[in-house]
């Protein structure tokens, strides 16, 4: 192994916030396969958000998002960090444990990004489902993944069509709605919109 190559990747590893620094920097394997930092552990939220705040970029914009109504949402790193922390706290309050499995049902929205980064922040395994998936396709994934919680942007009509029977069959699954219109169902947790979404 070329020492120069290893030193190059060792230097690049300093860019990353590690929970556990890797000892294996760059490994060449059979059939021209390579691995980088294979024994290191990191958290994506720490590297996407915390690192930028620590580098004095907290007042810089992290996300520009345009919704279907052409409303523009611009959020700075510090604001985004607060939203992620608030949603992380919400997930903890509904008794999710470390290593919980989460299904996030939603389009490429701002709330979906918050949900993903909150799950990463807490160490929850998560999978994102497209909003357009049919009820049958969602059921297959629920049976396969066996999530502890489903997070969705579904409003009442879509909830009744896609999720009502799933929750009836899987009584242990929690359901969180961050719909603009409240979903009427005893099993649904509502998001405090003041703490979560800041559309400007």
Where are these regions (language model features)?
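N-lobe entry segment of adenylate-forming
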Residues: 1-75, 79-86, 180-187
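A generic secondary-structure signal
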Residues: 51-52, 86, 90-94, 140-144, ...
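Short hydrophobic segments within beta-strands
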Residues: 64-66, 105, 129, 151
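Asparagine-rich low-complexity intrinsically disordered tracts
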Residues: 70-71, 92-93, 97, 174, ...
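Conserved AMP-binding/adenylate-forming
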Residues: 73, 90-133
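Structural core segment of the AMP-binding/adenylate-forming
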Residues: 117-194
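Short, intrinsically disordered, charge-balanced linker/junction segments flanking boundaries
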Residues: 195-200
